[in-house]
Curated annotation (Swiss-Prot):
Keyword Cytoplasm: no
Database matches in InterPro entries: NA-bd_OB-fold (IPR012340), Ribosomal_uS12 (IPR006032), Ribosomal_uS12_bac (IPR005679)
Organism: Anaeromyxobacter dehalogenans (strain 2CP-C)
Family membership noted in the UniProt record: Belongs to the universal ribosomal protein uS12 family.
UniProtKB keywords: Methylation, Ribonucleoprotein, Ribosomal protein, RNA-binding, rRNA-binding, tRNA-binding
GO molecular function: rRNA binding; structural constituent of ribosome; tRNA binding
Alphabetical list of CDD domains matching this protein: Ribosomal_S12
Record text on subunit structure and interactions: Part of the 30S ribosomal subunit. Contacts proteins S8 and S17. May interact with IF1 in the 30S initiation complex.
NCBIfam families: rpsL_bact (TIGR00981)
This protein's name: Small ribosomal subunit protein uS12
Gene3D superfamilies documented for this protein: Nucleic acid-binding proteins (2.40.50.140)
Length: 123
């Protein structure tokens, strides 16, 4: 345990809080270009083919992000907007692609929770 004079001279070092979405660099969203669009399988108790994309961001980071909703139109070189938010059963996927912006079209025929999937109101 340090003495009072040692603390006066040096002080205590602050603990660094680990960021959950470091590639965003404090921004709410970031734009990027898809370098690879593919499906992957989730962790142990679950079973599915989850749609994910590898995205090169404007700040140089390359991240894996989840494509939410049923069906998508994304392919290599599609420009997308990503937000933070991990997918619990996909290790290493810490970002979501925002549907209905840039090249990612909204989910077709969606009636409820439309704002999360970029779906326009059915008229």
């Amino acid at each position: 345990m340090p003495t009072i004079s040692q603390l006066v001279r040096r002080g205590r070092e602050r603990l660094q809080v680990k960021k959950k979405a470091p590639a965003l660099k404090e921004s709410p969203q970031k734009r990027g270009v898809c370098t690879r669009v593919y499906t992957t399988t989730p962790k142990k108790p679950n079973s599915a083919l989850r749609k994910v994309a590898r995205v090169r961001l404007t700040n140089g980071f390359e991240v894996t992000s989840y494509i939410p909703g049923v069906g998508h139109n994304l392919q290599e070189h599609s420009v997308v907007l990503i937000r933070g938010g991990r997918v619990k059963d996909l290790p290493g996927v810490r970002y979501h692609i925002i549907r209905g912006t840039l090249d990612a079209v909204g989910v077709q025929g969606r009636k409820q929770g439309r704002s999360k999937y970029g779906a326009k109101r059915a008229s």
